């Protein structure tokens, strides 16, 4: 944990901040990075110690900030939390874009995703599973909204649209436990690329396969992932 310098928070929903305070209380060198509006949302919505603020390091959308040797730019995403953001992370020549908990692909999301060699993007639900599943109608409507979550098929079309040889790793994240499975998400997202003739690696060893055009992985919902070694495609 000594090498970890900060925790970047996308928004104030409980599944994104639940363990942040317990981590920084134990490892006091770690800062909590979020927008001031997101911090206010966290303090308002959750039963959390006021000392949470002691670890706060503010940032603002579209204004780059630094954590150690990483340059980070937060950008707007469409979700129903408070001041929701994704992150564009730069380290040397490496570019990593993260967008999770978003109901649609906005121009700002697209702007940063197209610059990255590595992307982490939500692939939350399979539409048929959601519509025939046990969720109440109001919850289905929330998920389907433009400030809800991304359907596997939407993510698949978007990745197929933006793919270029420089894109080496795609991480699918925030998969629903009730309305999705890793196999369904991967099958849906990889199919358009297969149809275009691209070779897809699964990143199973945590390293880039030089036989594949791109590595696509579905990240686990509840467990830690393996450690991935990110290397840009030399194409």
Question: Which residues make up each language-model segment?
Answer:
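Metal-dependent catalytic neighborhoods of phosphoester/phosphodiester hydrolases
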Residues: 18-28, 44-46, 180-187
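Active-site metal-binding motif and surrounding structural segment of the metallo-beta-lactamase
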Residues: 1-38
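Cap/insert and terminal regions of metallo-dependent hydrolase folds
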Residues: 107-218
């Amino acid at each position: 944990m000594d090498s970890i310098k900060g925790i970047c928070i996308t928004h104030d929903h409980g599944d994104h901040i639940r363990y942040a305070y317990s981590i920084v209380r134990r490892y006091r060198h770690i800062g909590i990075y979020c927008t001031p509006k997101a911090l206010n949302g966290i303090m308002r919505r959750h039963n959390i110690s006021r000392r949470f603020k002691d670890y706060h390091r503010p940032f603002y959308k579209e204004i780059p900030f630094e954590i150690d040797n990483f340059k980070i730019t937060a950008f707007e995403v469409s979700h129903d939390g408070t001041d929701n953001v994704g992150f564009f992370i730069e380290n040397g020549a490496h570019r990593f874009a993260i967008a999770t908990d978003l109901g649609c692909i906005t121009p700002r999301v697209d702007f940063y995703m197209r610059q990255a060699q590595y992307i982490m993007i939500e692939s939350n639900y399979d539409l048929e599973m959601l519509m025939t599943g046990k969720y109440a109608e109001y919850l289905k409507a929330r998920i389907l909204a433009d400030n809800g979550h991304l359907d596997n098929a939407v993510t698949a079309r978007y990745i197929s649209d933006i793919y270029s040889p420089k894109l080496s790793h795609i991480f699918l994240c925030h998969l629903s436990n009730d309305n999705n499975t890793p196999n369904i998400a991967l099958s849906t997202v990889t199919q358009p690329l297969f149809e275009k003739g691209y070779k897809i690696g699964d990143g199973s060893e945590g390293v880039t396969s030089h036989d594949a055009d791109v590595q696509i992985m579905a990240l686990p919902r509840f467990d830690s992932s393996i450690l991935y070694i990110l290397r840009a495609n030399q194409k």
